[in-house]
Structures are given as C-alpha cells and as structure tokens.
C-alpha cells in the first residue's frame, strides 16, 4: 500500500512542527514540506501549481500570520488579508486538485467576547468579537466557513479544529510580545538568575484560563483528521462543523504563576499588581464534542510547563526574541 502524501502548511510554526514531529514517527506517511521561500502561500498560482505537481492526499493547514495585541492593532489589514489569502489559496487549490481530506487549524478567538462559559461550538457568531483581534478572528471564521462550503457544494471532507491557549516547544519567548506562559517562564528564569527578591505579575491573579500543550494539540489534530467520515458527520453539523480542542480544565493566573515559579525553581515572592487590568474573568472551551469523539488530553499543566522550560533552556540561543 502506498504511503499517504501529507502536506503540512506551516510546518515550522509551533503547531505545525508538533504535527510534523508526530507524523514523522510513522511509517505509513510521506510528508511534503515547503518553507516560505520555497512556496509563497499568498500566491494563488504558486499554490495551485504546487498542488498540481505534488499529488497531495491530505493537508494540515497550520500556516497563519499570528501576533499579539499590539501587532493586531497596528497591522489589522495584514492580519485579515494574509490569513484569508493563505486559507483561500490552500483550500481552493486542494479542491481543484482533488485533495479530499484537509484539516484547518483555527483559534478560540472566533468566539464572542462575552460568550457563555465554557464556550461550546454553538457560540460561534452569537455576539460581538473582541475588538483587539477582530480581523484575525474574522479570517479564522472564514476558514471554517470555507471548509464547510466546499463540503456542502463539492462533497469534500474538510474539517476544522479550534484550539484553546497553546504553549510548548517553539513558542515565542520575546519579552514584550509573548503570551502569558512563555512570558512568565522567561521572567521567572531571569529573576532566578539575578536572585531577584520578587516577581511582579500584572493583575489580581484571579482570571481563569485554559492551557493545552502543543503536543496534545498535534495529537488531537491527527485524531480528528483520521476519524471515519461517518463518525465525524454524526458528531458535527454541516453549518457548525468545527471542533473545540482543549483540556476542559482551567486555572487562575495566580495558580499558573505559582506553578511556573515551582518549575523554574524560583524562591522569591510572587507579587500581583492589582492596579493592572485583568482582562476577561474566564475563558474556557467546552470540549464535550471532542470527548465524544474519543480524544482526551494527556499532558498535565505542570508536566507540560516543565518540558517547555527544559526546551527553553536548551534553545536560548535560538528562541524568537
């Protein structure tokens, strides 16, 4: 039996590289990989020619333009245009070249700012988005709807997964624009090295957040991609087909900071500056649908933080920032 030819778009990113690591361990697939220099995903002709020549069987669409609040506010046109072009080019070229299986990776920012907690898939389009990343969220919603539309019109098997907050190897550890886990890991690491008496964390520490290790995200993505078509259809709806991916468990920012201090070995005080904004009180995905499909996360938060910190220590000369 010939090997499945699988294209991972975005194989150098945090999620794409995790999917690559897991698929590389198998003997029944052949991975097709292209760097940004080798294939410009914003160029529809180049993407079409690539699909026409490579005979792809499956696509993991993990490529995206990503960034923090400042970048989203500064370059909103770039975020909506580039993400919609990447999705449109890949999904349309896949269809034109008879690729029947595709998995689109989105983001939990697709849900309304004031969505019911925990957020079920049915919360999509039920309210106003968070203004700071609305262009990015709109692009991710468009990706879901592209998949659903090609399924409805052409009978394709294009699926979507929406991850919660991710962390792990190949994350962005830049001091000014990283997400909470890499930011705190780096801050506690530097405080330990400098024997700082305390580390100040913004906010009261009471907001609750959910975190998923990127290796679990990769495993969930492969699980959803490989579900029998009938099973996937039974557990989704044609116009509401995306699947949340998370742990279904959240923790306070205070608990997160204390766990990171423990993992890093920081012995000083952790101080919460309640004069700084807290953000949304709670953000948790409802993963009932994912559990019904037989997938549960395996990596505990403390174990995941420990392995991520180890990766950080081993890659300080190359991490972003």
What is the role of each PLM region?
Residues 9, 34, 59-65, 102-108, ...:
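SDR active-site strand-loop-helix element
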């Amino acid at each position: 039996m010939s090997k499945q030819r699988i294209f991972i778009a975005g194989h150098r990113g945090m999620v794409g590289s995790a999917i690559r690591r897991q698929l590389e361990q198998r003997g029944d697939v052949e991975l097709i990989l292209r760097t940004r220099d080798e294939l410009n995903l914003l160029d529809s002709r180049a993407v079409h020619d690539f699909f026409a020549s490579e005979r792809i069987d499956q696509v993991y669409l993990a490529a995206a333009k990503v960034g923090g609040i400042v970048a989203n506010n500064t370059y909103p046109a770039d975020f909506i245009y580039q993400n919609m072009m990447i999705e449109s080019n890949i999904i349309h070229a896949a269809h034109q070249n008879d690729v029947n299986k595709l998995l689109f990776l989105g983001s939990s920012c697709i849900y309304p700012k004031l969505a019911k907690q925990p957020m079920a898939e049915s919360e999509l389009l039920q309210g106003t988005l968070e203004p700071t990343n609305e262009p990015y969220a709109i692009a991710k919603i468009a990706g879901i709807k592209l998949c659903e539309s090609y399924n409805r019109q052409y009978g394709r098997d294009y699926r979507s997964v929406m991850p919660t907050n991710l962390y792990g190897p190949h994350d962005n550890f830049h001091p000014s624009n990283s997400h909470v886990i890499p930011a705190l890991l780096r801050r506690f690491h530097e405080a330990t090295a400098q024997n700082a008496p305390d580390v100040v964390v913004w906010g009261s520490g009471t907001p609750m957040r959910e975190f998923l290790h990127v290796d679990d995200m990769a495993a969930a993505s492969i699980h959803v991609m490989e579900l029998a078509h009938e099973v996937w259809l039974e557990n989704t709806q044609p116009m509401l087909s995306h699947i949340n991916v998370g742990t279904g468990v959240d923790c306070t920012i205070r608990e997160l900071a204390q766990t990171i201090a423990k993992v890093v070995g920081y012995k000083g005080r952790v101080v919460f500056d309640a004069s700084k904004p807290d953000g949304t009180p709670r953000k948790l995905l409802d993963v009932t649908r994912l559990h019904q499909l037989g997938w549960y996360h395996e990596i505990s938060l403390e174990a995941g933080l420990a392995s991520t910190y180890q990766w950080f220590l081993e890659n300080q000369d190359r991490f972003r920032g």
